Design a protein with these regions (language model features):
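A short glycine-rich beta-alpha junction/loop motif
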Residues: 1, 78-85, 119-148
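Non-catalytic DNA-recognition/assembly elements of restriction-modification systems
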Residues: 1-14, 30, 137-211
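Short coil/turn segments at secondary-structure boundaries
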Residues: 16-23, 113-116
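Short, well-ordered beta-strand elements within core beta-sheets of diverse protein domains
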Residues: 68, 85-90, 132-138, 152, ...
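Short alpha-helix capping/helix-loop boundary micro-motifs
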Residues: 36-46
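A short beta-sheet element
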Residues: 47-49, 53-108, 121
Length: 211
């Protein structure tokens, strides 16, 4: 069995139109919290792939970063960078969640890292045909579902912990800023009333020196 036996690469291209709002799945938006961008077609510079309602977007550029995106929503006008391969999962053969974790597995990632084409500098792309022809072995569907469910639950917990840590860091930064502001106000409050006395003391000292 090969990857092409469990997913279908959908290569329908879209030319964005001015005045139409699109949900764009791009590499920058993946890196920035995996949230698609809402853009007018006039702000999108090139043709994109149409994104099915339920699919997996597999990035063919620099696969070592594992930019693999699960999509499962009814949003209209979903499009993606052509650096992604939109893959519809054959759920009669493979569990959707299991398929996702299979595609980001070390074995597939390491294999593809050795199959890069167009390799120059930091931009290394895979050949989609090489990817789709990778041989795989699937466990029974019941085992797939169990594995997919377990790994998905772990990822969910990791994401929640990340959000908690991000909020704590933001809260600490805000508290530190407020502390610095309050400390500055306290210093000014302590020093300001004494400025006339300080000024007179300096003048007195100068008078003594002159005498």
């Amino acid at each position: 069995m090969r990857i092409k036996d469990i997913v279908t690469f959908v290569s329908k291209t879209i030319t964005p139109k001015q005045g139409v709002t699109y949900n764009l799945y791009s590499l920058p938006s993946f890196d920035d919290g995996k949230t698609s961008e809402r853009l007018d077609g006039a702000d999108i510079q090139s043709n994109k792939y149409d994104v099915p309602n339920k699919c997996i977007l597999f990035n063919k550029l620099n696969v070592r970063f594992r930019r693999v995106w699960k999509v499962d929503n009814q949003d209209e006008n979903k499009i993606s960078s052509t650096e992604f391969l939109p893959l519809i999962v054959n759920e009669k053969v493979v569990d959707f969640q299991y398929c996702y974790y299979l595609l980001i597995s070390d074995s597939i990632t390491n294999y593809l890292c050795g199959q890069n084409t167009n390799t120059s500098g930091s931009h290394k792309r895979i050949d989609p045909n090489n990817f789709l022809n990778i041989e795989i072995t699937l466990p029974k569907m019941s085992i797939q579902k169990q594995i997919g469910k377990t790994l998905s639950a772990l990822d969910h917990k990791i994401e929640i912990n990340k959000q908690i840590n991000d909020n704590l860091r933001a809260s600490r930064a805000q508290s530190q800023t407020q502390f610095e502001l309050c400390r500055g106000e306290a210093v000014n409050a302590d020093v300001s009333p004494n400025l006339p006395l300080l000024d007179r003391s300096l003048k007195g000292a100068e008078a003594c020196l002159v005498a």
